[in-house]
A protein has these predicted regions:
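C-terminal motif of bacterial Sec signal peptides marking the signal peptidase cleavage site
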Residues: 17-21
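Short, well-ordered beta-strand elements
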Residues: 67-101, 117-121, 144, 264
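Extracytoplasmic/periplasmic solute-binding protein
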Residues: 74, 139-145, 149, 187-209, ...
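Extracytoplasmic "Venus flytrap"/periplasmic binding protein-like
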Residues: 114-186, 219, 338, 359
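Short, solvent-exposed loop/beta-turn-alpha elements that line the ligand-binding surface or hinge
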Residues: 169-177, 281-302, 375-382
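Glycine-centered hinge/linker elements that transmit conformational signals in sensory
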Residues: 239-242, 282-327
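Extracytoplasmic/periplasmic substrate-recognition and gating elements
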Residues: 358-428
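Conserved C-terminal helix/tail region of periplasmic/extracytoplasmic solute-binding proteins
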Residues: 393-405, 415-505
Length: 505
């Protein structure tokens, strides 16, 4: 982890030097010394990157000219109001000076120069539906599908996707693939989709926590970055800190939205990152494609009991749950405003929401992972929103798997040191300060993301809805409800595994 973070810092500094060099020179009396130190540190980290097998360029350099072939990626066309999720990572027309735009331009130029391939995009409101029709007709109008994990999972079960394990050049051990999720994605010898560095919504959908530094400082809460590093950031500590922040401002004995200060803001879906954050496995895949049902394990039962103690509806004295205000117009926009107005100490959300907050928030804030269950837990674990995280797949209709594999791998490899650092830089500098602590936390969050197949196929298993109901119930009776629900989940999983392993793929 430390080596990967050093590599990332080198990339981040390289990406940001034109933006920050003047500021660096004014931070000390001797700007030259500061600049020299940073340059030396960057050079050392870049040397580490060159020697790391996970970041070594092993793609061919000769005789791979595809003579201006257009490699088309089918992706999402979002409504104008969906600022957080708009696709900006596939292809752009020109340099504009905007960091991510120019990084995509550079990445695509590298691919064009080296392999004679032009990257093009076809954005559709429902790309998976369009993709299915094209695949059914045998039309190879697109080379790669970029859509949500939830949609990719559905297409995998229905037999529309090629096994990415069969693609030449694709190497899931490389740093530009999200290797921490592969254990949950791979079913036996089949991998039908994967998360890589070229698809930024795969990163944006990551669950994390923000803390309002004005409120944590006021409550006398110690440095939370150090707490995370020391392995002491736990659910118990979060609740203690949240309760210390909460204030009934007008003293009327009732906590009210927009009037009082809440300790933590969340939603019913927050049970997913909190439960996965304990290291719990819901459905555990075995190498041979079989699975182990874990929803009744002691670990899951104990974790759910603790999470219920934190999230239940009666905890409104310090918890603000946005789902309790479903009748409110623009409730999610207003929810963010509560945090921005210093009326919420902690906020559990997806990374996509950070930039919607950063531009207009006066108080500073920090990024940290969701907490562990207790200090004895081996590490922090994170996850993402399966209905928003973009992943990549290859249509079964693809006719040249060598070319498809090569360009897919090149997209990830070149994104790793162009698009991804630009996204980090954009996310962090939008806060008006370069925060290497938050950069370190993002690196930790991305490297520890867990994938649970039962959540990817939630439309069939119903596991997320089941967990949400139990997380907020004032009367906790998880064991009996899990027993009643188990047959439904196992039946769905049996069908999923059978189709993925032995269906028309």
């Amino acid at each position: 982890m430390k080596k990967r973070f050093a590599i990332f810092v080198a990339l981040l500094l390289a990406a940001s030097l034109p933006l920050s060099s003047c500021g660096n020179q004014t931070q000390t009396e001797s700007g030259t010394d500061t600049e020299t130190t940073e340059t030396t540190g960057t050079a050392e980290a870049e040397q580490t990157a060159e020697n790391d097998p996970a970041t070594l360029d092993e793609l061919p350099t000769d005789n791979m000219d595809y003579q201006d072939y257009t490699f088309t990626i089918l992706g999402h066309l979002y409504e104008a109001g969906s600022v957080a999720w708009g696709v900006q990572d596939i292809a752009v027309d020109e340099l504009t000076g905007e960091r991510i735009n120019d990084a995509v331009f550079e990445r695509n130029n590298r691919i064009a120069d080296r392999f004679g391939v032009t990257i093009a995009k076809n954005l559709e409101t429902y790309p998976s539906d369009v993709g299915k029709k094209l695949i059914q007709s045998g039309d190879d109008a697109f080379d790669l599908l970029q859509t949500t994990v939830e949609k990719q999972a559905s297409m995998a079960v229905d037999g529309y996707l090629a096994n990415m394990n069969d693609l030449p050049y694709v190497n899931f051990e490389k740093a530009w693939w999200d290797s921490s999720t592969m254990e949950g994605i791979r079913v036996g010898d089949k991998t039908f989709y994967a998360l890589g560095d070229s698809a930024l919504n795969g990163k944006k959908a990551s669950w994390l926590m923000l803390f309002n530094k004005t409120l944590t400082d006021k409550a006398g809460i110690p440095n939370l970055y150090d707490t995370v590093r020391e392995g002491k950031w736990t659910l118990d500590l979060l609740q203690t800190y949240a309760e210390s922040i909460a204030v009934d401002v007008n003293g009327d004995g009732e906590m009210k939205w927009g009037e009082d200060v809440f300790g933590v803001g969340l939603q019913d879906e927050s049970v997913s990152p909190l439960l996965i954050g304990t290291g719990a496995k819901l459905i555990e895949l075995n190498p041979d494609g079989t699975y182990n049902y874990r929803l009744n394990s002691e670990q899951v039962v104990n974790a759910m009991e603790r999470i219920n103690g934190f999230m239940k509806k009666s905890n409104s004295n310090f918890v603000l749950n946005c789902n309790r205000y479903d009748g409110m117009s623009n409730q999610w926009i207003e929810f963010r405003k509560i945090f921005m107005a210093d009326q919420m100490g902690f906020y559990i959300l997806a990374l996509s929401g950070v930039n919607l907050i950063a531009g207009d928030m006066q108080s500073d804030f920090g990024i940290i992972p969701v907490p562990k269950l207790n200090e004895a837990q081996d590490q922090y674990y994170s996850t993402f929103q399966y209905n928003n995280a973009h992943s990549l797949s290859v249509p079964k209709s693809a006719r040249d798997l060598t070319r498809t594999g090569l360009i897919t791998e090149a997209l990830q490899m070149f994104s790793h040191d162009t698009v991804l650092p630009a996204y980090y830089d954009y996310t962090l500098t939008n806060r008006n300060a370069r925060d290497t602590d938050s950069a370190e936390m993002l690196d930790l969050i991305f490297a520890s993301r867990n994938f649970d197949i039962s959540l990817a196929y939630n439309n069939k298993t119903g596991v997320l809805s089941f967990l949400q109901t139990n997380a907020v119930a004032d009367s906790f009776d998880y064991a009996s409800k899990e027993t009643a629900n188990r047959q439904k989940v196992e039946k769905a999983m049996d069908e999923i595994i059978e189709k993925v392993l032995h269906g028309d793929n």
